[in-house]
């Protein structure tokens, strides 16, 4: 039975995180930015699970923390989308550059 090496998990996590970071920094659509942030959180979860499984002392702590992170990410997505809907009703746009509601 062949096992996937830790470097494969870490490489995939780095690629996912870089794609998410690039999208979060370059895109102007708020929905896309939220999706990219979720992608970055999933890359962190992949690291947690990989180190939990392939670390020096394998245990379920990383997996439990990953589940907790997913619950927090779901709450973050729900709150972010609720704020986005409220801003869209006021401004009729979802572009980051035009979100200046808090300016005096």
Swiss-Prot record:
One of its GO terms (molecular function) is NADH:ubiquinone reductase (non-electrogenic) activity. Pfam families: Oxidored_q2. The chain crosses the membrane at residues 4-24, 31-51, 67-87. It is a multi-pass membrane protein. Keywords: Cell membrane, Membrane, NAD, Quinone, Translocase, Transmembrane, Transmembrane helix, Transport. GO terms for cellular component: NADH dehydrogenase complex; plasma membrane. Gene3D superfamilies: 1.10.287.3510. It is found in: Cell membrane. Its EC number is 7.1.1.-. Belongs to the complex I subunit 4L family. NDH-1 is composed of 14 different subunits. Subunits NuoA, H, J, K, L, M, N constitute the membrane sector of the complex. NDH-1 shuttles electrons from NADH, via FMN and iron-sulfur (Fe-S) centers, to quinones in the respiratory chain. The immediate electron acceptor for the enzyme in this species is believed to be a menaquinone. Couples the redox reaction to proton translocation (for every two electrons transferred, four hydrogen ions are translocated across the cytoplasmic membrane), and thus conserves the redox energy in a proton gradient. This is NADH-quinone oxidoreductase subunit K.
């Amino acid at each position: 039975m062949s096992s996937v090496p830790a470097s494969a998990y870490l490489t995939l996590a780095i690629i996912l995180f870089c794609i998410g970071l690039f999208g979060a920094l370059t895109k102007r659509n708020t929905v896309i930015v939220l999706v990219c942030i979720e992608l970055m959180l999933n890359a962190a979860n992949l690291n947690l699970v990989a180190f939990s499984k392939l670390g020096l002392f394998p245990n379920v702590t990383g997996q439990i923390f990953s589940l907790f992170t997913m619950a927090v990410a779901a709450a973050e997505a729900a709150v972010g989308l609720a704020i986005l809907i409220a801003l869209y009703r006021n401004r009729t746009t979802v572009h980051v550059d035009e979100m200046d509601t808090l300016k005096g």
